Regions:
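A conserved regulatory-domain signal marking ACT and ACT-like small-molecule sensing domains
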Residues: 1-76
Length: 76
C-alpha cells in the first residue's frame, strides 16, 4: 500500500510524517520526496496498513502543513 501526501516544503516535514507512522507502528518501506518552491509531495510505501486508516489519516492532517492525504492500493 502507498500513501500520497502533499504539504508545504518546510523544515522537519519528513520528520513529522515519520513520527506519525511510528506512532501507528507502520514500517516505511520506501519514501519518495519531491518539491518545487513552497510545495512538496511524498509517496510513502508501507509494508502493511491497518484495515481502518481513519486515525492514521487524521493524524497526518493534524500536521499543520499537510494539504492532502490519499491512500492508494489499500487492500481489504
Amino acid at each position: 500500500p502507498r500513501i500520497a501526501i502533499s504539504h508545504s516544503n518546510i523544515v522537519n516535514m519528513i520528520g513529522q510524517l515519520g513520527a506519525v507512522f511510528t506512532k501507528h507502528q507502520i514500517n516505511i518501506d520506501k519514501m519518495v520526496n519531491n518539491s518545487k518552491g513552497e510545495l512538496a509531495y511524498n509517496i510513502i510505501v508501507c509494508d502493511i496498513l491497518p484495515q481502518d486508516v481513519t486515525e492514521l489519516v487524521a493524524d497526518l492532517y493534524a500536521i499543520a502543513s499537510v494539504k492532502k492525504v490519499r491512500v492508494l492500493n489499500q487492500e481489504g
